[in-house]
Swiss-Prot record:
Oligomer status and interactors: Interacts with Pka-C3; interaction inhibits the catalytic function of Pka-C3 and the esterase activity of sws.
GO MF annotation terms: lysophospholipase activity
Basic and acidic residues: bias regions: 1429-1444
Name of the protein in its database record: Neuropathy target esterase sws
Record lineage: Eukaryota, Metazoa, Ecdysozoa, Arthropoda, Hexapoda
Organism field: Drosophila grimshawi (Hawaiian fruit fly)
Length: 1464
């Protein structure tokens, strides 16, 4: 059998060999014969052609010779002279040949345009070009690729050579105390001492006095903590130029309290030189300059709140650990709250009952107490079940009743000198409560409160008359809110007389913990017991309250409002020490230890925080400003890794992993940072292990975020790196020319930004009127920067409108800006002006973006954008903005303000270009990604219509393959009807098969030449560039030259769309003319992601069908982007989109394949295929396997996109349609529309559509949460002490800081506000009490507030809510929520006149000041008497005001000049 098999095999092989050889011989013979015949015929034709030319030329020569001979014979016969012997002269020869040559040149030039050899040559070249498909070199305009300047990626190394090093270090160290003038700085330098330390010497030890500031001039100092068991732990290492000090100890020393080192020790690591500055040196300066003392205390409190509390609370999760529940070494200044035993309390009670006058009773009631009781419901449980337990009150330090009769007898002898001054106050208190009997004498309560607060403020008994008229006493029921977190109106100094107050703070993890059932939005920080004070931190910083304060049980509190404290401060500046000392006493030892370790760093633009390859021993928190992280590659090239904004943590991963710095981080603009050393982290971790959990959670979120964006990075970046974010906090707006309507543009942008969150618009006029005309001087730099920093903290974004010249305000805007918007008119010249170049030199590191404005009346599309960008290489991004007609209307400043006072009342159009720009600046852009799928891409049109009907704005568009075509149509037209029409026309062209047959070519690279396909795309878009599209757009292609995907955001549109559709095998790759790379369909690597049509064509270069498209910029060959990424949602996310809708129309591979075992026979597959009686099998063929291999990376990328949290993945049901079914355009479009409409309706019902179409808050703004310029204005306490003149004089308010200062303004000065303002005060400013404006006031931005107030809605008013005794989450009644009628102006729409109506609003003051006579007269003529009844509390307040006014009149008559011009 083996022999037979061998014979059969040999015979088969022999026959096969014979047959193949015979066939090859026959073919070769036929080809050889054909070649011979064709060669012979070709040679014969050549010979005939040559012979014809030769014969023609020979005949021409013979004819010429015959004519010459004939003429010569005739001439000789006529003259009788034989010319054969004559010769011409040389001059005649030269003339003859010269004329002949000129005649020939003329004939040659004529042949170039008529006929002859030139015409034939051109015809042959045209024929050859058409046959060989040669193309002329016709490259379009390209974007110039310019490297950023060295300053953009490099730090500033230049130093201050003019200042000695020791003076420079000292100047930087004491900068934490604020800005000092040169004379004051020189006085401090006189007290400095130089300390020489050897290695191992102690700088200070435990029990040494903590009364100095130490500045390291050279060497290194180690600061460590000594534990109770004798072990030590390094806290931080102080290097050259750094300092060691505690600002909290600084307050102790100034307050006269001795401070000693208890747990902190400093030792020299090496030989060091240290500068010692005693804290007592500041005493001399402060005595001569009280304003400097107040400013230093304010800076210390601001640092405590912004640095210490921010770092420990927000990043380490420490809240209650920062304060101590019982103040240490607290000598209670409240004689009502002294700790007494139960027997003592009972004995005092019995003695008081026997010796109390008979007219008194035992039931404590007051109007406030009755009001609080009425607000509670009967069903509420008792919040304090132990309220009647005397032992309970003894243990908690809050006695329910303590007799004041004996206290009155004791205080009569002490208070006799000031009895007369307090008589009227006591009589007012008694008169206010005469209607209801009470046990506790109100006069004694008032006197006790005044005495207690006087001691807390550090005032003597002789100063009691200063504060007694400002002290108010209230009785509270449980769960009454005194002030809420973030409230700047009701800031007071609260002193607890009886009962307890609970201090809460919002939970930093409330957002992530909201999914948990036990999550609490607030955390209990500490309790305030009788004899303790609270509210000093917000009072000294001038900012809003950082805590929410509620009464824990029935309590009695005494308080002084913020305006009153500032008036007292003008007379007694040293009360800031008492307030600061009260804040310091409340802090825990942990905060004091952290105060030694934490540093507050100020960095100018260009200065480096740390450099690459340095040791990482600390991390940094960005308090304000912007940082840029730059990595230096081994070849020396620098690249941006990320940028950090306000609140970001920098360098945390490197510090924890103990690795060297991987990047260099430098300040883009002037910035403030908090430095947290590694030793502090270790010390806190040992004491509070919960910090480790917080850090793990923080690092996990950062690691997951980097994993989602790592796939699209060209190079590996550390986990620490933060991708370049497009969320800015400050934006500067600069006009290119004077005719740019910058003010209307700023208003429109402000209008759109207001829908996202609190925003502020600042101009030079606004800042000048708020802070003074000299605020831009160098001496006022601290005040200006502090004020601007506070405005940035209170708003999500701040708009800095620059002047049209390089003024000091413009320079300040450049220093404060995170990004600069250069605004120009798109239809004007693109030339760069001198002012614009100065702006670039002034802020070289700041990112700049170009904004081109177009009027909507011209219907013109953007054009020539490349010229704008090439002229400005410093621009990193551009925006096309279509503007309404009102922006380009020429009006005066007042008319513009009046116009936008009405515009700002309306809801912004979320689909406008201004809203798109607003979302980009705030990091809320919505991106649309369209995947590839051939004819199934018609579903994109239906989905676009469904998206438009769902109200979802589209800010960015990216596409691959057919998605690149549809996305480019939408970005170009932005009209669903026009987009549908053009897409349908293009699909019809794709169904004309006779044109495709003419495009067939020899299939070496592809089946089609791609010429007709290019023509269809070019006819659709024309010569449009990607830069000229209305909406930012990108397409993705597969670069087969560099074996990667390429993202095209600029260049020829049709070319890169064509390259993204170059499917392998159908079209040749597109060759990038810039670098010669071959580009294929981008879907091979990423199926969801210049002239416009070129990149569209490149994105549609299907390999094998159409040839790859050659990029005209670099020569790379481009293919369809579907080979790399068919749904490039990750690319869209990296480009700045926060929310993405990804639509996938690609085909799905069959994964249900047959398991055929270890081997596979093709004959078996053939048998299964052709035998109808067997079960079919699913085995991929060779083309299918190649296709699956090509799409491997695309499938992996698609799965990552589906699992991401930033993308909404949508796939319409279009699987039944084939890739080339372009004839079913309308049917596929309808399928996509119906599916999209149902999909978005389902999302809307489920509440998941809000992040796409409800990015703004539709609720009317409320007083409690709306930010206004005056509400968050920076309060410079030093200015109060100096009694500087007012910047903006207010008639009718004699004092700069009146008690009702917070009610003077309730809106931005720069733009209209939706809050109510006391219109009566404003009318005093006008001539004749009118609200109209004179022509001299047309350029005032402040008038915008006044116009806005006329159109305020009653919805802005809030009403008090009933408290919940148990739940903290339920809104609780506020102490200031007292409904009182006030007069509000309203405009009659029919007549346009101002009317006065009576509304009920929540007053923010306890005692509303009485109106001035002029105001009363105005109110009498325009108001109607209130119909509501006054409450007993209102009567009490009015009577109290009358008593105070009588006292003031008597004091004036007696010559007593106390502070009589204030209002209580």
């Amino acid at each position: 059998m083996d022999v037979l098999e061998l014979l059969r095999a040999s015979a088969t092989g022999c026959y096969n060999t014979i047959f193949s050889e015979a066939w090859h011989q026959y073919v070769h013979k036929q080809i050889a014969a054909a070649v011979y015949w064709y060669g012979a015929l070709f040679l014969l034709g050549v010979l005939l052609f040559v012979w014809f030319l030769y014969f023609k030329r020979l005949a021409r020569l013979r004819l010429r010779d015959e004519i010459a001979r004939s003429l010569s014979a005739v001439t000789s016969a006529a003259t009788g002279v034989d010319h054969r012997g004559l010769r011409f002269r040389k001059r005649d020869k030269m003339l003859f040949y010269g004329r002949r040559m000129l005649r020939k040149m003329k004939n040659v030039s004529g042949q170039m345009y008529s006929s002859g050899k030139g015409y034939k040559r051109r015809a042959v070249m045209r024929f050859a070009r058409r046959i060989l498909q040669l193309q002329r070199e016709n490259r379009p305009l390209e974007m110039k690729t310019v490297e950023p300047p060295a300053e953009y990626l490099e730090e500033t190394i230049e130093g201050s050579d003019r200042v000695p090093p020791d003076a420079l270090y000292m100047l930087q160290s004491i900068r934490i105390f604020g800005h000092f003038e040169k004379p004051i700085f020189l006085k401090l330098c006189k007290h400095t001492q130089i300390l020489q330390l050897m290695a191992g010497d102690y700088l200070f030890k435990i029990t040494d006095p903590d009364d100095s500031v130490y500045i390291v001039q050279s060497g290194m100092i180690n600061v460590y903590i000594c534990n109770a068991d004798g072990s030590t732990l390094s806290l931080k290492t102080v290097r050259k130029g750094e300092s060691v000090t505690s600002l909290l100890s600084f307050i102790d020393v100034l307050s006269g309290n001795s401070s000693y080192y208890k747990t902190v020790t400093a030792k020299a690591i090496e030989k060091s030189v240290v500068i010692r500055l005693p804290m007592q040196a500041f005493e001399e300066v402060f005595d001569e300059n009280p304003d400097v003392m107040i400013r230093v205390i304010q800076v210390i409190m601001i640092r405590l709140q912004r640095v210490l509390f921010t770092a420990l609370r927000n990043y380490l999760g420490l809240n209650a650990e920062l304060v101590q529940n019982h103040m240490r070494n607290k000598n209670s200044s409240n004689p009502m709250a002294t700790g007494q035993t139960t027997s003592n309390v009972q004995s005092q009670t019995s003695q008081a009952t026997q010796s109390r006058p008979s007219g008194t009773t035992r039931t404590p009631t007051s109007p406030m107490l009755r009001l609080s009781r009425e607000e509670h419901t009967l069903s509420d449980p008792d919040p304090n079940p132990n309220a009647n337990n005397l032992h309970y009150h003894e243990m908690h330090g809050d006695a329910p009743y303590i007799d004041l009769y004996h206290y009155q007898q004791q205080q009569q002898s002490l208070n006799s000198p000031r009895r007369n001054s307090t008589a009227h106050v006591s009589e007012a208190a008694a008169a206010s409560t005469a209607s209801s009997p009470t046990t506790i004498d109100q006069r004694l309560v008032q006197s006790s409160a005044v005495d207690s607060l006087r001691r807390e403020l550090g005032l003597g008994e002789e100063d009691a008359h200063i504060i007694e008229q400002f002290v108010l006493v209230r009785e509270l029921e449980p769960n009454v809110t005194l002030i809420t977190e973030g409230n700047a109106d009701d800031v007071c100094i609260w002193f607890v007389m009886t009962g307890n107050l609970a201090v809460y703070q919002s939970n930093a993890d409330a957002t992530r913990a909201s999914a948990k059932q036990d999550a609490k939005p607030e955390m209990l920080i500490h309790f305030v017991h009788p004899g303790e004070i609270v509210g000093g931190l917000a009072m000294l910083t001038g900012e809003a309250s950082a805590y929410t304060i509620r009464s824990r049980n029935n309590s009695r509190v005494a308080f002084i409002r913020r305006a009153a404290i500032y008036q007292i401060m003008r007379q007694r500046p040293r009360i800031v020490l008492g307030l600061g000392n009260g804040v310091v006493r409340r802090l825990s030892p942990l905060v004091r230890q952290c105060d030694y370790a934490l540093d507050w760093i100020f960095l100018e633009s260009g200065r480096a925080v740390y450099r690459q390859d340095e040791s990482s021993d600390s991390t940094y928190i960005v308090l304000s400003g912007r940082m840029r992280s730059v990595i230096t590659q081994p070849n020396g090239k620098k690249e941006i890794v990320g940028e950090y904004g306000k609140g970001d943590l920098v360098g945390i991963v490197e510090m924890i992993t103990e690795t060297s710095r991987t990047t260099t981080v430098m300040a883009v603009r002037d910035s403030e940072l908090a430095k947290l050393p590694e030793g502090l982290f270790n010390a806190i971790k040992l004491r509070y292990p919960i910090v480790v959990t917080r850090l793990i959670s923080f690092l996990s979120h950062r690691f997951l975020g980097s994993m989602q964006t790592r796939g699209s990075n060209a190079y590996g970046t550390p986990v620490e790196a933060n991708p370049v974010t497009h969320k800015y906090s400050t934006v500067a707006l600069v006009p290119i020319t004077d005719d740019v309507p910058l003010t209307p543009f700023t208003y429109e942008l402000y209008h759109s930004l207001c829908a996202i969150g609190p925003v502020l618009r600042l101009t030079s006029e606004v800042v000048g009127k708020q802070l003074g005309v000299n605020i831009f001087d160098t001496a006022n730099e601290y005040r200006l920067t502090s004020w601007l920093a506070q405005q940035e903290d209170r708003n999500i974004i701040t708009l800095y409108q620059c002047d049209s010249s390089l003024s000091p305000w413009t320079q300040r805007c450049m220093r404060q800006a995170d990004v600069i918007l250069i605004v120009g008119l798109g239809e004007r010249s693109h030339l760069v002006g001198k002012f614009e170049r100065e702006i670039d030199k002034l802020a070289m590191r700041t990112q700049k973006e170009l904004v081109l404005l177009y009027p909507e009346t011209t219907n013109a599309k953007p054009a020539n954008t490349l010229s704008w960008l090439n002229a400005r290489p410093w621009v990193t991004k551009h925006h096309h903005v279509l503007c309404v007609k009102r922006i380009f209307t020429r009006k005066s400043q007042y008319r513009i303000n009046d116009l936008y006072s009405r515009v700002l009342l309306s809801e912004p159009n979320m689909h406008s270009d201004f809203s798109r720009l607003a979302r980009w600046l705030t990091g809320n852009s919505i991106g649309l990604v369209l995947g590839g799928g051939g004819a199934r891409g018609a579903a994109h049109i239906g989905m676009l219509k469904a998206i438009q009907e769902a109200g979802i704005p589209i800010d960015m568009v990216g596409g691959v393959s057919i998605g690149a075509l549809m996305g480019a149509l939408w970005c170009s037209e932005r009209n669903i009807t026009t987009v549908t029409q053009k897409a349908r026309e293009w699909s019809k062209k794709m169904t004309k098969w006779f044109l495709q047959l003419l495009d067939l070519t020899y299939p070496i690279t592809s089946m089609f030449s791609g010429r007709e396909f290019n023509k269809t795309i070019h006819d659709t878009f024309g010569d449009v560039t990607i830069e000229d599209l209305w909406i930012p757009y990108f397409t993705l292609t597969t670069d087969i030259t560099a074996s990667c995907h390429r993202i095209h955001t600029n260049g020829s549109l049709w070319r890169f769309v064509r390259s993204s559709m170059s499917l392998s095998g159908y079209m040749p790759p597109l060759c990038d003319p810039q670098d010669g790379h071959l580009l294929l369909d981008g879907g091979y690597v990423n199926n969801l992601p210049g002239h416009l049509w070129r990149y569209c064509r490149a994105s549609m270069s299907i390999a094998g069908v159409f040839p790859p498209f050659c990029d005209y910029r670099d020569g790379h060959l481009l293919l369809d982007g579907c080979y790399t990424n068919n749904v490039p949602a990750d690319v869209m996310h990296n480009l700045g989109a926060a929310h993405i809708i990804a639509i996938d129309v690609g085909s799905q591979d069959d994964t249900d394949l047959t398991n055929y075992g270890d081997d596979l026979s093709g004959w078996w597959l053939l048998y299964k295929k052709w035998n109808p009686f067997t079960s079919p099998v699913k085995v991929p063929d060779l083309p299918d396997i190649q296709s699956r291999l090509a799409y491997v990376s695309c499938v992996r990328q698609l799965e990552e996109v589906k699992n991401s949290d930033y993308c909404e993945y949508i796939r319409p049901p279009i699987d039944k349609y084939k890739t080339l079914a372009f004839g079913s355009f309308d049917e596929i479009r309808d399928v996509g529309y119906v599916f999209g409409k149902n999909y978005f309706d389902t999302m809307a019902k489920a509440g998941r559509l809000g992040r796409f179409n409800q990015w703004f808050n539709k609720e009317p703004p409320k007083r409690g949460n709306h930010a206004s310029l005056n509400e968050y204005t920076f309060i410079d306490l030093a200015q109060i002490v100096c009694k500087l003149p007012e910047t903006y004089v207010r008639l009718g308010t004699p004092d700069l800081f009146s008690e009702d200062e917070d009610e003077d303004f309730d809106g931005y000065i720069s733009e209209p506000t939706t809050l109510n303002t006391d219109r009566r005060r404003i009318q005093v400013h006008r001539a004749g009490n009118s609200l109209s404006f004179s022509e001299a006031e047309l350029d005032s931005d402040v008038e915008l507030d006044l116009e806005m107030e006329n159109k305020v809605d009653k919805a802005t008013q809030s009403t008090p809510t009933l408290p919940d005794k148990r739940s903290v989450q339920t809104p609780t009644p506020s102490l200031f929520n007292l409904t009182m009628p006030i007069a509000v102006d309203e405009i009659d729409k029919s007549s346009g006149r101002v009317k006065r109506k009576l509304e009920a609003t929540n007053t923010a003051s306890i005692a509303e000041p009485e109106a001035s006579p002029s105001i009363k007269a105005e109110a009498t003529t325009q108001t109607t008497p209130p119909t509501s009844k006054r409450t007993e509390q209102d009567e009490h307040e009015l009577e109290h005001e009358q008593v105070v006014e009588k006292q003031q009149v008597m004091d004036k008559q007696q010559g007593n000049t106390t502070n009589n011009d204030t209002k209580n």
